[in-house]
Amino acid sequence: MKKLPQFVAAVAAAALVAAPCALAQTPSMQHSHDSPPARTSNSPLIDKVRAATARFVDVNVALHEGWVPGTPCVSGPDSGAMGVHYLLLRRLFDGVLNADEPESLIYEPMPNGALRLVGVEFIVLAADWASKHPDGSTPAVDGHLTNYVDAPNRYGLPAFYELHVWAWEHNPNGSFADWNTQVSCDRQAPQ
């Protein structure tokens, strides 16, 4: 559990530094004004996620509601990207997974500095899940099993379970794959 305080401190520090900067930018620099693509889904989970997160197409709404930048844009060497993860810390540490309440919103940085909502990630720390589910069950979100990520990991988190849902951007690898080849960190505006 030594890693958890370090992670919390890192996220808190990032939030203190990034949130004022993000709020100081004009709304046009902070989110895309393009309407989200009209889309129908064969997945009730994707439909639930879209309904629950539609207001966060504008990242300023997420910031106002307490979401904080948790990662820079995460990309893979040949697998596309995940994007920038914004976290709601009270959900991250509650040991619960709820289809209407993702722990992370995922945004793709755009060349003009805007952030475009592309998906969500459900995250539960393994120890928190185990304490509430001593039967050893694997966490699931609306019947979709999560992936286990052991520690140490690139995020500095203790072991956790996660499930990506690409509700706002088509993923050729599947709506629940970790990496999305349609998402890129290469298009972000120079810092």
Name what the model sees in each region.
Residues 5-6, 15, 110:
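Hydrophobic alpha-helical context, especially transmembrane and signal-peptide helices
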Residues 9-19:
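Bacterial N-terminal signal peptides
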Residues 25-191:
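Primary mode marks residue(s) on the alpha4-beta5-alpha5 output face of response regulator receiver
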Residues 20-24:
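Sec/Tat signal peptide C-region and signal peptidase I cleavage site
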Residues 1-11:
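Bacterial N-terminal signal peptides that target proteins for export
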